[in-house]
Amino acid sequence: MSSHILQVQNLSKVFETENNRFTAVDSVNLEIHGDEFFTMLGPSGCGKTTTLRMIAGLEVITSGNILFDGQDFNKFSTFQRNIGMVFQSYALFPHLTVFENVAYGLHIRKVSKTTITELVNHILDLLVMSELASRFPPDLSGGQQQRVAIARALVYNPGMLLLDEPLANLDAKLRVQMREEIHRIQKDLGIMSIYVTHDQEEAMSVSDRLAVFNQGQLMQVGTPHQVYAKPQSLFVSDFIGQANYFPAHITNRNGSGVQVTLTKGLELELTSLVTLNKDEVGSIEPNFDGIVMVRPEHLSLSTSDSASLSCTVRRIMFLGSYTRYIVNCPDSRNEVFVDSPRPISGIEEGSKASIGIEEPDAILFHKGNS
């Protein structure tokens, strides 16, 4: 197991032109430990790749520090940082065999031929690619080319592995296979890995922890479950998974929880509270307005009028392991998504129905918006 520690401290990157100044990364703080598989997730232009490039030494830092095992990375070139990198473009040499592509970095490092042979054969065995050693990149599938790029990044035993959208050029089924392969290899080697993607399912499936970025800012860091179940902003709740939103009015403070009323009079007792204005933490009081967020699996549909919120079922989608109901509800900001592990008897497209909310899993966002 790796004992390395990467610390990113108040990291910022500003791009300046004659007429413009753009902050791509704004005061980001991160700490990544040992053999973590850590993912930086966010929409295009959010700053995740720029952060990765600064860690790699491919982008000049405007301000802040990057420390690896206490050493200031700013004092080392990309080559000296001992980092393995895999990018969206595999950048394989078409005139070199798989073996020669993997060995290329070792030749640059002036490693002996005997050691090169041992190291390359070992990494090809680990990636189950030994039989491809004499083939050329144009003769390989996309997944095989990706494995070659990974082998080349790992063969010299780097201190950390950086992966920037490495599966973007693969089809959907192969992406799933390769992300599991990357996760297996990473855990087998016990190497710290930092993975950049905009694909939330990809991030959730492979990460020990993930960081959600938006507009250059770090919005939240946590395990996939923490970020999904306890989002700390409306942006994170919307970007990670599907979310439903209901305008609410706070009517009573009750210990650590609150009582809220939705627009049609439904009362809820909630204990999961998020203050959106960080200057007002703990100041929630009656008569404030807020937004209740509920995941689709924590809603239920019923033909009974007593369930709570009235709605009309617009669309029913059977998605294999669950059935998704898309309903129109005047109490919600948008269409409401309800996920059920099995089809609900008596509910059809066009049906009138009622929505029930699982209160322990609902979150109240209050004081402003994000």
Model features per residue range: what roles?
Residues 41-43:
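The feature captures the beta-strand-to-loop junction immediately N-terminal to the Walker
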Residues 56:
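Helix-to-loop junction immediately C-terminal to a conserved catalytic motif
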Residues 76, 80-238:
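ABC ATPase nucleotide-binding domains
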Residues 243, 253-370:
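Non-catalytic connector elements of ABC transporters
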Residues 1-14, 305, 368-370:
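ABC-family P-loop ATPase nucleotide-binding domain
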Residues 64-72:
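Conserved ABC transporter NBD signature motif
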